[in-house]
């Protein structure tokens, strides 16, 4: 593969590994659709709970139940990102028990080797 091909991207590789990348937008869409579906079904208990609230556990349980069949529509209707492949990543996102500042500091240290940024 030429350097230019690598910079631009390899279309076949991108299509082959499209399910390998879970974006923040995908997680947001999953949570938003979970809320919409639960409201549609008349399940209003803790529907507005934040991810750090205890009530968000009901959202997580609903997502866990549906994850094996859940998908996100990507660039066209024929391409869907199957979320069951990302179960571990989704669980780790939902189990963050820190403030945003603590999470930022942790990521900065992990990826940049930076000292604690307070």
Swiss-Prot record:
The record's listing under Pfam families reads: Baculo_LEF-11 (PF06385)
**Keyword set, alphabetical order:** Transcription, Transcription regulation
- Indicate what this protein is called per its UniProt record: Late expression factor 11
Q: Which organism is it from?
A: Adoxophyes honmai nucleopolyhedrovirus
The positions making up the signal sequence are none
GO aspect biological process, one term: regulation of DNA-templated transcription
Statement: the UniProt record of this protein carries the keyword Transcription regulation: yes
Concerning its family, UniProt says: Belongs to the baculoviridae LEF-11 family.
Its function?
Involved in late/very late gene activation.
Which InterPro entries does this UniProt record tie to the protein? Baculo_LEF-11
């Amino acid at each position: 593969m030429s350097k230019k091909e690598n910079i631009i991207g390899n279309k076949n590789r991108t299509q082959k590994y499209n399910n390998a990348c879970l974006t923040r937008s995908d997680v947001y869409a999953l949570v938003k659709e979970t809320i919409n579906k639960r409201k549609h079904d008349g399940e209003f208990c803790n529907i507005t709970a934040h991810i750090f609230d205890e009530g968000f556990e009901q959202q997580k349980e609903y997502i866990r139940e549906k994850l094996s069949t859940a998908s996100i529509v990507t660039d066209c209707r024929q391409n869907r990102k199957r979320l069951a492949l990302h179960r571990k990543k989704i669980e780790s996102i939902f189990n963050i028990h820190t403030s945003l500042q603590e999470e930022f500091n942790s990521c900065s240290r992990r990826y940049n080797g930076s000292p604690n940024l307070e």
